[in-house]
Amino acid sequence: MNIIEQLEREEIARLAKTIPDFEPGDTVIVNVRVKEGERTRVQAYEGVCIARNGGGLNESFTVRKISYGEGVERVFPVHSPMIDSIKVVRRGKVRRAKLYYLRDRRGKSARIVERNDRPAKAEKAPAAAE
């Protein structure tokens, strides 16, 4: 293990965020801290995870939802301090790692079949630094 990987593992352990095991195709609720003036509040953002990018500290994921008839995508860093929590609502059965084709689909063709083979796992704690 090189020094960079070791530093990233130590930083992830220091952050001590519980991140559920989710994949593209899963419907997730991301609770995001939003600052409005002087106060902060938590806003829920529910949608389909269409991609996961990167690894380690720089890992991010893209969530797509339809809001008032318009498609809205938002990219979240997994280890961002602005993310309060992530909850997996349902598991989706897909055969691709990147679901960008959903951008061109509307209605029934944009549906994702629910996966029944395994339930949503309990949240996993980050691996301890060795």
UniProtKB/Swiss-Prot annotation:
Belongs to the bacterial ribosomal protein bL19 family. This protein is located at the 30S-50S ribosomal subunit interface and may play a role in the structure and function of the aminoacyl-tRNA binding site. One of its GO terms (biological process) is translation. Keywords: Ribonucleoprotein, Ribosomal protein. It comes from the Bacteria. HAMAP family: Ribosomal_bL19. This is Large ribosomal subunit protein bL19. Gene3D superfamilies: 2.30.30.790. The keyword Ribosomal protein applies. InterPro entries: Ribosomal_bL19, Ribosomal_bL19_CS, Ribosomal_bL19_sf, Translation_prot_SH3-like_sf. One of its GO terms (molecular function) is structural constituent of ribosome. Coiled coil: none annotated. GO terms for cellular component: cytosolic large ribosomal subunit.
